[in-house]
Structure formats: C-alpha cells, structure tokens
Amino acid sequence: FKDGPLALGMHKRGSFYDIVTVENCQIVDEDFRKILSVTLAYFREQNITYYHKLRHTGYLRHLLVRKAVKTGEILVDLVTTTQTDFPGIAGAQMDEVESTLNNVQENAFAGTEEELLEGWKAALLAADYKGIMTGILHTRNDNVADTVTNEGTDVLYGQDFFYEELLGLRFKITPFSF
C-alpha cells in the first residue's frame, strides 16, 4: 500500500499503485510461492526499497518467474532500477530518507549491488524446489513506464533461458518470450 512495507505480488483491485503480497495464492505453482517468499524475506531483511512510480525512487521493480510445465525448469529474473547508489541508500533517495527517517531502519544494507544480488542468489539456491532452477537473472530497467524493459541483463546463475516441450516440439523460453 502507499508508502507501506515492501510487498511482492499482484496489484490491488482497482489500484494501479498498491501491491498486495500473495504468498498463499493457490492458483500458481508451489515453486512460484517459494521464490516469492524467499525474495520478499531477503530484501525485507536487507531493508531494500521498492520502486516508487511517482517519485522514481527505490530499487526493486519487478520479479519475473517462468516455469516449464513439462521439463520443470525454472527461470527467475529480478528487475531493478539503476537509480540507487550503493552502498546503502544514497543519491536521489536521500531527500526522501531524511523526510521519513522514522520509517528507515538503522541497519540498512551497506554493501555493493553485487553483494546484494549474490546474497539473493544464495537465498534462492538454498531453497528446495519441485522443479529445477536453471537460471537467476538481474535485469536493469530505468524506463519511467510501468513495463519491464530490458536495458541490460546479467546472468547471476545458470543460463538466461529454459526449454519447454509441447506436442513433441522443444521451445527455448527467455524472460521476454511473452
């Protein structure tokens, strides 16, 4: 919700801005729920902020999760902005931080972006999945629109695609295939 805690899930009905965490959603695969839970817990623990669409501040924008039904292969892509300086919170966010100091915890993440992403990757790989984790990606997106635009992707683990089989055909699926 507006200026609320970090949330990861779906847009609240009738709201373009509010996100509701859907940790127990039964219409998605169990592996999706586990990835969402691990990601949310990790970034909350690190005090990393979500991207605020109107202020253009914050770091986390989108989490893409793809899983092949037939092969069970899983691809995860974290989409972030590059507008946050590391270590910790700096740059454009300082004015916002100073005005909301009571809401900022003292133990904000003080490492580099690489260290932050390595920690997230390790947390994801430590979890147990029914499927097979084939790739963990980090995509940068500074587009002001609320769309996932690829302005550069790094492979943190594995590969940047997975395979799915359908009617005897094999398809190579990337984060931006659909």
Where are these regions (language model features)?
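Accessory RNA-recognition modules of RNA-modification enzymes
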Residues: F1-F178
